[in-house]
């Protein structure tokens, strides 16, 4: 389980897309490259914000967190897109603008989780490793995730 992990994969995703992923609104992350990786990963929001996307989607960019790990999600499969029409048909799952319709691979996501306390971290290209043991506030973050996930298991079950 997540709270037992100390070293996790992480992927930088520009804002507002990072927030959309951890809130469960964006379920496909488009990339130009494929991956064999399946499982939980951390979602990192780099410093750059896609302002044109914020305007288009009516997102207040001043409320977006950057330079931090904002949550986690799970990749359970990769969809290969063979045409722009296919990409456009999944728009409500990836929200990519026209400039990204050349991206051929869609990482299919599930089980998103937003952190209430983001972890300050410098991003990198592609998947990179994050050692939670040495991260700032790691114990608090792991405890928070454990508490939230434990509580979630019991909602509506008493």
Question: Which residues does each PLM region occupy?
Answer:
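Structured alpha/beta reader/binder surfaces that contact nucleic acids or chromatin modification marks
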Residues: 2-158
